[in-house]
């Protein structure tokens, strides 16, 4: 999930691959759609603006409700916000059958910019990383209380980081001297494990990704939630998924391929990626990948 802009732009932001998503969703008058990862509401607003339809907006982050209220004022009685995790999409929506669902995965730039959420090493903040702040497990708990072996496993499995063991060892050594409580302190510990030279991405990137994915059970939620979502589609309706790293995309690819030809038709034989113009305008979109499947 990638978002650009400041406070005003957050409300009016353009999501990655928006025109492609709308093309595949093909919203119709009277249709019912689901934005399973509402965020700042870019997809919800675009769908509502395209035709006279209804959109269920789901997000586990209660703080995004302020963005929904703006959209609700613009499109009264045409949308409903549900504060919940899309892993529970079946129970959140009940027996509703829908005309299309969009998933825009990962953490948004909007969330990354809020220092006290602890998602980014670019902003000094507490080691939190919870998308749903009503849950208990934080990144601070993981790095200060989990075993070295467990920390290494998390970093390797969810960050695909080859230096995972060295990083875990450095974390455990550092916490013996002082509790690790901030994003900057963790980032410095991770960076100390790498030779001092230029890197295309910050050496701390994969470790922060791994902790965030683990704490929020992002991959487990994706597989379960997406599988349930497919059962909610009407014939001729589509699920559009935008992912931002290989772990997410692998789950989507394998699930879509497993149901292709068995009541579903895979519409994207190859992944859809942003155009050069979009990447130039929004560099954080460069890793986005879209896959689409249709109920037949």
UniProtKB/Swiss-Prot annotation:
Q: Which InterPro entries match?
A: RsmH, SAM-dep_MeTrfase_MraW_recog, SAM-dependent_MTases_sf
Kindly list the biological process annotations in GO that this record carries: rRNA base methylation
Tell me the domain of life. Answer: Bacteria
Work out whether the entry's keyword set contains Glycoprotein: no
Gene Ontology molecular function terms on file: rRNA (cytosine-N4-)-methyltransferase activity
* EC number per UniProt: 2.1.1.199
Top-level EC class: transferase
Q: What does this protein do?
A: Specifically methylates the N4 position of cytidine in position 1402 (C1402) of 16S rRNA.
PANTHER family from the xrefs? 12S RRNA N4-METHYLCYTIDINE METHYLTRANSFERASE, S-ADENOSYL-METHYLTRANSFERASE MRAW
Please state what the protein is called: Ribosomal RNA small subunit methyltransferase H
Lineage runs:
Bacteria, Pseudomonadati, Pseudomonadota, Alphaproteobacteria, Rickettsiales
């Amino acid at each position: 999930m990638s978002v650009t802009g400041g406070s005003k732009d957050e409300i009016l932001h353009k999501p990655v691959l928006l025109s492609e998503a709308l093309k595949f969703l093909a919203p119709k008058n009277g249709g019912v759609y689901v934005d399973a990862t509402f965020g700042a509401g870019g997809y919800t607003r675009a769908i509502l603006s395209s035709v006279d339809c209804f959109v269920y907006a789901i997000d586990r982050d209660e703080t995004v409700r302020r963005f929904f209220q703006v959209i609700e004022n613009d499109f009264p009685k045409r949308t409903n916000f549900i504060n919940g995790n899309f892993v529970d999409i079946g129970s959140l929506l009940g027996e509703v059958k829908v005309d299309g669902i969009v998933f825009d995965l990962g953490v948004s730039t909007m969330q990354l910019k809020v220092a006290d959420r602890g998602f980014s090493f670019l902003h000094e903040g507490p080691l939190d990383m919870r998308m749903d702040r009503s849950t208990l497990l934080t990144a601070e708990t993981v790095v200060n209380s989990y075993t070295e072996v467990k920390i290494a496993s998390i970093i390797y499995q969810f960050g695909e980081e080859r230096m995972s063991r060295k990083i875990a060892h450095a974390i455990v050594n550092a916490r013996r001297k002082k509790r690790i409580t901030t994003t900057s302190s963790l980032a410095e510990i991770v960076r100390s494990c790498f030779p001092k030279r230029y890197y295309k991405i910050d050496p701390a990137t994969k470790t922060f990704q791994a902790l965030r994915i683990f704490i929020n059970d992002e991959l487990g939620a994706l597989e379960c939630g997406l599988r349930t979502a497919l059962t909610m589609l009407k014939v001729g309706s589509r699920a559009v998924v935008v992912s931002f790293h290989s772990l997410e995309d692998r789950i989507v690819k394998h699930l879509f391929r497993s149901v292709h030809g068995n009541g579903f038709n895979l519409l994207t034989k190859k992944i859809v990626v942003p155009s050069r113009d979009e990447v130039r305008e929004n560099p954080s979109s460069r890793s986005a990948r879209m896959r689409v499947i249709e109920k037949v």
